[in-house]
Amino acid sequence: MRLDVVTIFGEYLQPLQLSLIGKAQAQGLLDVRVRDLREHTHDRHRTVDDTPYGGGAGLLMKPEPWGEALDAVLADPPEDADPRGPVLVVPSPVGEVFTQRAAVELAAEPWLVFACGRYEGIDARVVEHYRTRVRVREVSLGDYVLNGGEVAVLAITEAVARLLPGVIGNAASLTEESHAPEHDGLLEHPAYTKPASWRGLDVPAVLAGGNHAAVERWRRDEALRRTATRRPDVLARLDPERCDARDLAVLAELGWTPDGSGFRAGGDPVADSSDTNEP
């Protein structure tokens, strides 16, 4: 996979040289190219911003440097590029909320281009124009505002790159974590390691009992409980057809009942057992 990142703060992307993402680049699994937006300016001050039409606070990034920068990227495609071109990812507080499902979708692409806005964002005509040429996804990390898109690029890149074959040593671990499709997008169950007892807190006995079926059942139950109490919005989207009788019983205890293609909360919530010392 190739990633092109257009930014005015290339130093911000240096953490991509570390840890598993850095190793993936060294192994040829990932090709990250950071491009300086200011290289596409034509005044001695290398200006990339100006005041917004209609007034208002702050400055807006000009379309001309962005047009030249993105055109230069598109003119240099990788050999395995999709005939439709790259997916242009624009971090923005007005974009779709980035999820694990979005990470999976982007990980299937051979080429991503990131446009890192600053100040009050990028002139709206840039996204409008490139929607006619490539696939564009405006993406938000959540309901808050950052100073620029670089932090979002770091997060999205890590979420996407770790899904590429060979980046994570044990690929099975990708299916045993929060939001994994293989576990219906539920939050991950509580996890424990040695010692068995620490500061008066014991590992649940079922995990040390050697009964693998019981362990898997406990993990599923705890995933359901944790999701119900911490992310009810996720649980509401759980497909009842994916639930067995035990799942339905656990959810009923928590006040959740099937409702069409999802679940509906209709009772009093039960405390998250992972926050207690109970097995």
Swiss-Prot record:
<dbReference type="Pfam" id="PF01746">
    <property type="entry name" value="tRNA_m1G_MT"/>
</dbReference>
<dbReference type="GO" id="GO:0052906">
    <property type="term" value="F:tRNA (guanine(37)-N1)-methyltransferase activity"/>
</dbReference>
<protein>
    <recommendedName>
        <fullName>tRNA (guanine-N(1)-)-methyltransferase</fullName>
        <ecNumber>2.1.1.228</ecNumber>
    </recommendedName>
</protein>
<comment type="similarity">
    <text>Belongs to the RNA methyltransferase TrmD family.</text>
</comment>
<dbReference type="GO" id="GO:0002939">
    <property type="term" value="P:tRNA N1-guanine methylation"/>
</dbReference>
<feature type="binding site">
    <location>
        <begin position="141"/>
        <end position="146"/>
    </location>
    <ligand>
        <name>S-adenosyl-L-methionine</name>
    </ligand>
</feature>
<feature type="region of interest" description="Disordered">
    <location>
        <begin position="256"/>
        <end position="279"/>
    </location>
</feature>
<keyword id="KW-0963">Cytoplasm</keyword>
<comment type="function">
    <text>Specifically methylates guanosine-37 in various tRNAs.</text>
</comment>
<keyword id="KW-0949">S-adenosyl-L-methionine</keyword>
<comment type="subunit">
    <text>Homodimer.</text>
</comment>
<dbReference type="InterPro" id="IPR023148">
    <property type="entry name" value="tRNA_m1G_MeTrfase_C_sf"/>
</dbReference>
<keyword id="KW-0808">Transferase</keyword>
<dbReference type="InterPro" id="IPR016009">
    <property type="entry name" value="tRNA_MeTrfase_TRMD/TRM10"/>
</dbReference>
<keyword id="KW-0489">Methyltransferase</keyword>
<feature type="binding site">
    <location>
        <position position="117"/>
    </location>
    <ligand>
        <name>S-adenosyl-L-methionine</name>
    </ligand>
</feature>
<dbReference type="InterPro" id="IPR029026">
    <property type="entry name" value="tRNA_m1G_MTases_N"/>
</dbReference>
<dbReference type="InterPro" id="IPR002649">
    <property type="entry name" value="tRNA_m1G_MeTrfase_TrmD"/>
</dbReference>
<dbReference type="InterPro" id="IPR029028">
    <property type="entry name" value="Alpha/beta_knot_MTases"/>
</dbReference>
<keyword id="KW-0819">tRNA processing</keyword>
<dbReference type="GO" id="GO:0005829">
    <property type="term" value="C:cytosol"/>
</dbReference>
